[in-house]
Structures are given as structure tokens and as C-alpha cells.
A protein has these predicted regions:
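Extracellular/periplasmic ligand-binding regions of membrane signal-transduction receptors
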Residues: 1-18, 37-46, 50-51
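Solvent-exposed, extracytoplasmic
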Residues: 17-28, 115-159
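Extracytoplasmic/periplasmic ligand-binding sensor regions of membrane-associated signaling proteins
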Residues: 29-30, 42-121
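Short, hydrophobic-rich beta-strand element in sensory/regulatory alpha-beta domains
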Residues: 33-38, 140-143
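Amphipathic coiled-coil signal-relay and dimerization helices
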Residues: 42-52, 149-155, 189
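A short local loop/turn or secondary-structure capping micro-motif enriched for an aromatic residue
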Residues: 54-58, 125-126, 159-163
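Extracellular/periplasmic juxtamembrane segments that couple receptor/chemosensory ectodomains to their
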Residues: 136, 147-148, 157-192
Length: 192
């Protein structure tokens, strides 16, 4: 939004662009995010910067469903992405990393066309560690799943990226009560 408010004055825009890029880097390093991308229209100065700013066309790298793209609503879109590679300048690793993405796609209210988007990429291992530390009893399993049933974080890191069975996914997502017992297992679900 800050960039859009400065686009009529090229000198001010360049200054604001650098401030936003520095802020993104600060957030990334302060909070230990894997990476942060901001997606701009092709006509916007900086849309092809390639490190922190990409074209809106590049937003497709996250393989989001048509429904998520057509009606993003006011909520963030969470998903699990495999093999995301950072630009070589930021990481010289030959292989990509699996990440949890938190995306927002903002559309023009009149035209319904995307105006800009951003994605915060998170390390699933950090979430898994937090879940493991939540309970001392190792018989308690905690996990975060995406809408499609992909395990984004789990008390057992090895399960990150695997997919719940349709039966288990349905059990967790379609119950009206958040605390229930089934087959001698106790469940407490929290949905967005």
C-alpha cells in the first residue's frame, strides 16, 4: 500500500521502495522468517527486482487453488509448499526448502483484479519445535494442517509435508464441536 501511495512522484517512490525493502529484510531477520515476497503489478517500478519483489504473475509459484485465488476474502491463505528456491544472491543452496506460506492477495474492489500480494515463508521445523514444546507428555500429538489436509507442522518433524487420510481430515474439519472423543482418542480442534 505504501508503494501505491507514492507512485505519482518517481523520486519519492524510489525512496519509499528502498524503505519497504529494508523493512522486509528487517522483519525477515528479526522474526526468523524463511523469506518474504511482495508481488506487484508488472507496470509498477520494482516488480522485477527479483529478491523481495516479484511480478504478480509470479504469485502462481504457490500453487493455490482457483477458489483461493478468485475469492481470497479478508483472511490469509495458508499452505505447505515443497522445494521453494530463493534467488541465488540470497541462498546458494542447490536444493529448495519446504515451507509454510502465509499469503494475502488484495484485489481492487471495483475491477476484482489483483492489485498486489505478499507471502511470508516460514520454516516448518520451527513450528514443529513449538508444538513439541507445548506438552511434556510425548503421547500428545499436535499438528497444523492446511485445507487440503497437508500436515504443515507436527510434533514429529518427519510428518511435515505428508497428507492426512481423507477420513482423518473429514473428522477434524467437519465436526461442529471443537472438543470430542472418538475411538478412545481425545481431540481438540481449532479452526480459523
Amino acid at each position: 500500500y505504501t508503494l501505491f501511495s507514492a507512485q505519482d512522484d518517481p523520486d519519492r517512490y524510489r525512496s519509499v521502495f528502498n524503505e519497504v525493502r529494508n523493512s522486509i529484510y528487517l522483519y525477515k531477520t528479526t522474526f526468523g522468517f524463511y523469506h518474504i515476497y511482495s508481488f506487484l503489478p508488472d507496470t509498477q517500478l520494482g516488480a522485477f527486482e527479483g529478491l523481495y519483489f516479484l511480478s504478480l504473475k509470479d504469485f502462481s509459484m504457490f500453487d493455490l487453488s482457483e477458489t483461493q485465488l478468485k475469492t481470497p476474502g479478508t483472511s490469509s491463505i495458508w499452505s505447505y509448499q515443497k522445494d521453494i528456491r530463493l534467488p541465488f544472491v540470497l541462498s546458494d543452496k542447490e536444493t529448495g526448502s519446504d515451507v509454510i506460506t502465509c499469503c494475502r492477495l488484495l484485489k481492487n474492489q471495483t475491477t476484482k483484479e489483483p492489485e498486489y500480494a505478499y507471502a511470508i515463508l516460514l520454516n516448518p521445523g520451527k513450528f514443529s519445535d513449538l508444538l513439541s514444546e507445548t506438552f511434556q507428555d510425548d503421547r500428545i500429538t499436535s499438528y497444523l494442517i492446511s485445507e487440503d489436509g497437508t500436515i504443515m507442522a507436527h510434533t514429529s518433524r518427519e510428518l511435515c509435508g505428508s497428507v492426512l487420510s481423507e477420513e482423518k481430515r473429514s473428522l477434524l474439519l467437519n465436526r461442529t464441536e471443537s472438543i470430542f472423543t472418538q475411538d478412545r482418542m481425545h481431540y481438540h480442534t481449532i479452526q480459523p
